């Protein structure tokens, strides 16, 4: 069960995703340029930014999500972070990798599952992102690209599976 995995395990996988982004930068940048017309230099920069974000969340998520005791009017209180479940992201086309990674990296590091409904004109980017997480070693289903028309998004939103929307 994904939510029961350790931060150390999740961090290792997220660092692998960062490595894959760096290693395959040209392939991913080319797909971004082909699908949505972004200049190749900007597409490369977007992929680089995504790799950096994966590394950042791999290194710092455990600290961000650590249990915290705070003094309140009630005395001493505990802030406890727990996985929510499946989180759906409905993303635009203009930053087809960055918008997704800035959602997926913290969601997955927190022990949640990420569901992506990307813009229809960047389906290739959507599927590449799913493959990056799979190739990095994330279990199948932990990050899923939902390739479907915009009109079906409401059905997914209303699903009992979805516990949050980004």
Question: Which residues fall in each region the model found?
Answer:
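Rossmann-like NAD(P) dinucleotide-binding subdomain of oxidoreductase/dehydrogenase enzymes
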Residues: 66-166
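Glycine-rich loop-to-alpha-helix module at the N-terminal edge of alpha/beta enzyme cores
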Residues: 1-64, 74
């Amino acid at each position: 069960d994904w939510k029961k995995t350790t931060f150390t395990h999740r961090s290792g996988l997220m660092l692998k995703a960062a490595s894959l982004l760096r290693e395959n930068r040209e392939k991913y940048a080319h797909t971004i340029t082909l699908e949505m017309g972004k200049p190749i230099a900007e597409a490369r920069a977007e992929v680089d930014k995504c790799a950096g974000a994966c590394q950042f969340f791999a290194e710092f998520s455990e600290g961000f999500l650590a249990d915290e005791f705070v003094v309140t009017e009630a005395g001493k209180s505990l802030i406890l972070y727990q996985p929510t479940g499946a989180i759906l992201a409905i993303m635009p086309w203009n930053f087809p990798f960055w918008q997704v990674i800035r959602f997926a990296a913290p969601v997955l590091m927190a022990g949640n599952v990420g569901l992506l409904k990307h813009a229809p004109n960047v389906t290739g980017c959507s599927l590449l992102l799913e493959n990056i997480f799979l190739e990095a070693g994330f279990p199948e289903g932990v990050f899923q690209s939902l390739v479907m028309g915009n009109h079906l998004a409401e059905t997914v939103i209303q699903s009992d599976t979805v516990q949050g929307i980004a």
